[in-house]
Amino acid sequence: MKSLRVLLVILWLQLSWVWSQQKEVEQNSGPLSVPEGAIASLNCTYSDRGSQSFFWYRQYSGKSPELIMFIYSNGDKEDGRFTAQLNKASQYVSLLIRDSQPSDSATYLCAVN
């Protein structure tokens, strides 16, 4: 019985640590419709001011998410038609997709570390 109590305490401590490590992230909701050739803007806000790294993933239907951009310092980071923008003071990160194409139709996810 003593070993069961010790095991439960250890499990509780591990769950408490996992719970404390969760960060709240919010993306703009609903589908975004953009004309071909236009700029698509996706936004994400986060709650933890200590967050250091920010990631954007693209997921095509039936496929696994793929990393398309990451950013860790304020300002803009460009990669081809994609630009990630980070403002740590306002706690937001955005993804701009220039010259939108039909192949850009996917689910976009932001993540914070």
From Swiss-Prot:
The UniProt record lists the keyword Cell membrane = yes
Q: What is one Gene Ontology biological process annotated in the Swiss-Prot or TrEMBL record?
A: adaptive immune response
Q: Which residues form the Ig-like domain?
A: 23-113
A GO cellular-component term linked to this record: T cell receptor complex
Report residues carrying sugar chains.
Answer: N43
> Where is this protein localized, as stated in its record?
Cell membrane
SMART domains reported in the protein's UniProt record: IGv (SM00406)
Pfam assignment, any one: V-set
Which molecular-function annotations from GO does this UniProt entry contain?
A: peptide antigen binding
Keywords attached to this entry? Adaptive immunity, Cell membrane, Disulfide bond, Glycoprotein, Immunity, Immunoglobulin domain, Membrane, Receptor, Signal, T cell receptor
Disulfide links within the chain:
C44-C110
Which first-to-last residue range defines the signal peptide?
1-20
Check the record and name the PANTHER family matching this protein: T CELL RECEPTOR ALPHA VARIABLE 1-2 (PTHR19343), T CELL RECEPTOR ALPHA VARIABLE 12-2 (PTHR19343:SF3)
| Subunit organization | Alpha-beta TR is a heterodimer composed of an alpha and beta chain; disulfide-linked. The alpha-beta TR is associated with the transmembrane signaling CD3 coreceptor proteins to form the TR-CD3 (TcR or TCR). The assembly of alpha-beta TR heterodimers with CD3 occurs in the endoplasmic reticulum where a single alpha-beta TR heterodimer associates with one CD3D-CD3E heterodimer, one CD3G-CD3E heterodimer and one CD247 homodimer forming a stable octameric structure. CD3D-CD3E and CD3G-CD3E heterodimers preferentially associate with TR alpha and TR beta chains, respectively.
According to its UniProt entry, what is the function of this protein? V region of the variable domain of T cell receptor (TR) alpha chain that participates in the antigen recognition. Alpha-beta T cell receptors are antigen specific receptors which are essential to the immune response and are present on the cell surface of T lymphocytes. Recognize peptide-major histocompatibility (MH) (pMH) complexes that are displayed by antigen presenting cells (APC), a prerequisite for efficient T cell adaptive immunity against pathogens.
- What is the recorded name of this protein? T cell receptor alpha variable 12-2
**Originating organism:** Homo sapiens
